[in-house]
């Protein structure tokens, strides 16, 4: 039992991170579109709700998670959220593995055009299931 997260949203908000600012435009999932997605997804609900923003969970709640495997896109507004979440889990002693694929952009799992990143995503999930 484990969680495999591809380019996850761990904080349902514009986080102002380096990746959010650096890849705000020109890399597929830009910051403005992500903002629109978040508004639609939240539909007025609290963005700090743990079901949409696991980064706001308490340490005790996070310690109850199964092993977490995070694979992010290197050129993605969400990259830093996923990596920050992984660092927090690691600091809590939770089993976690995380990487950001060099040169990849958001949606490498579901949209054609990044075959090397897609292949790594399949291998990553396969490794997590062992």
Language-model features: locations:
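Alpha/beta-hydrolase superfamily serine-hydrolase fold, recognizing
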Residues: 1-130
């Amino acid at each position: 039992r484990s969680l495999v997260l591809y380019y996850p949203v761990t904080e349902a908000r514009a986080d102002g991170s380096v990746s959010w600012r650096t890849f705000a435009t020109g890399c597929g999932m830009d910051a403005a579109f992500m903002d629109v997605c978040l508004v639609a997804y939240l539909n007025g609900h609290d963005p700090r709700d743990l079901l949409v923003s696991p980064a706001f969970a308490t340490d005790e709640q996070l310690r109850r998670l199964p092993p977490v495997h995070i694979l992010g896109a290197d050129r993605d507004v969400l990259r830093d959220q996923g990596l920050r979440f992984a660092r927090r889990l690691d600091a809590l002693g939770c089993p976690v593995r995380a990487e950001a694929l060099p040169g990849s952009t958001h949606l490498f799992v579901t949209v054609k055009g990044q075959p090397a990143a897609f292949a790594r995503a399949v291998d990553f999930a396969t490794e997590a299931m062992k």
